[in-house]
From Swiss-Prot:
Organism: Rhizobium radiobacter
Pfam families (alphabetical): SLT
The family this protein is said to belong to: Belongs to the virb1 family.
The gene coding this protein: virB1
Entry keyword set: Crown gall tumor, Plasmid, Signal
InterPro entries: Lysozyme-like_dom_sf (IPR023346), Transglycosylase_SLT_dom_1 (IPR008258)
Function statement: VirB proteins are suggested to act at the bacterial surface and there play an important role in directing T-DNA transfer to plant cells.
Protein name: Protein virB1
Signal peptide: 1-28
Length: 239
C-alpha cells in the first residue's frame, strides 16, 4: 500500500513539472559563478561538462530509477521532488552539473544545495580534482583530465571513453564560444601576458602567421611576471 501511494505521489508531482524549460544560465552567468565557486578548475572545462549534463539548467533532474528527465522553473518545487524521490530510494542526477545523489553526503550537498549553481559547480570541481592525476607534460595532463572526466561520469577511468561521454565533452568544449574579456590598456603588457605560462593554468595558442590551428608548447615564464586569475587552476582546458 505504501509503495503504491508513493508511486502515485511521484506521478502527481511529476505532472506539476513545467512543460517549459527553466531558463539556463547564460555563458556570462556561468563564467561568473564558476570563477567564484570553482576556481581550481578551468571554466571552459566545467562549461563543456555542464553543456553535456544539463544544458546549463540548474534545476534539471534525471531520475536513473525511472529514466525520467525533469526540468523545473521553481527551485522550491524542484527541491521537494528531489527529497521525495530520495525518500523513495531513487538514484538521481541533480542540478547544473548533474551530481549523483549517492555522492551528496561525501560532497556535503543537500537537495536544496544541489539545485543551486554555486554548490553544484563546487562539488563538480572537487570530484574532478579528486580524480585528476596530473602529469609531467601537457599531453600527460590532457590524458589525465580526460580520465578524470570519464570517472566523473562513470566512476571509472576507462568506461567514460567506451560509452562516448568523454568525446561528447570534447565536442562541447570545441563548440563553446570563449568569453570576451576586457583587453589590457597596455599593448606591451598584453603581448607579455600571451607568453606567460603556469603549470596549473591553461595555455592555448594558434598560429596566425601560418593560419594553422594547434597548441604550441610554451616556455616557462619569467619569475617577475605577475600571476593571472587562472594561475591557481588545477585542471587544464580541453584542447
Amino acid at each position: 500500500m505504501f509503495k503504491r501511494s508513493g508511486s502515485l505521489s511521484l506521478a502527481l508531482m511529476s505532472s506539476f513539472c513545467s512543460s517549459s524549460l527553466a531558463t539556463p544560465l547564460s555563458s556570462a552567468e556561468f563564467d561568473h559563478v564558476a570563477r567564484k565557486c570553482a576556481p581550481s578548475v578551468a571554466t571552459s572545462t566545467l562549461a563543456a561538462i555542464a553543456k553535456v549534463e544539463s544544458r546549463f539548467d540548474p534545476l534539471a533532474i534525471h531520475d536513473n530509477t525511472t529514466g525520467e528527465t525533469l526540468h523545473w522553473q521553481d527551485h522550491t518545487q524542484a527541491t521537494q521532488v528531489v527529497r521525495h524521490r530520495l525518500d523513495a530510494r531513487h538514484s538521481l542526477d541533480v542540478g547544473l552539473m548533474q551530481i549523483n545523489s549517492r555522492n551528496f553526503s561525501m560532497l556535503g550537498l543537500t537537495p536544496d544545495g544541489a539545485l543551486k549553481a554555486c554548490p553544484s559547480l563546487s562539488a563538480a570541481a572537487n570530484m574532478l580534482k579528486s580524480r585528476y592525476a596530473g602529469g609531467e607534460t601537457i599531453d600527460e595532463k590532457q590524458i589525465a583530465l580526460r580520465r578524470a572526466i570519464s570517472a566523473y561520469n562513470t566512476g571509472n577511468f576507462i568506461r567514460g571513453f567506451a560509452n562516448g561521454y568523454v568525446r561528447k565533452v570534447e565536442t562541447a568544449a570545441q563548440s563553446l564560444v570563449p568569453a570576451l574579456i576586457e583587453p589590457p590598456q597596455d599593448d606591451h603588457k598584453a603581448l607579455k601576458s600571451e607568453d606567460t605560462w603556469d603549470v596549473w593554468g591553461s595555455y592555448q595558442r594558434r598560429s596566425q602567421e601560418d593560419g594553422v590551428g594547434g597548441s604550441i608548447a610554451p616556455q616557462p615564464p619569467d619569475q617577475d611576471n605577475g600571476k593571472s586569475a587562472d594561475d591557481n587552476q588545477v585542471l587544464f582546458d580541453l584542447y
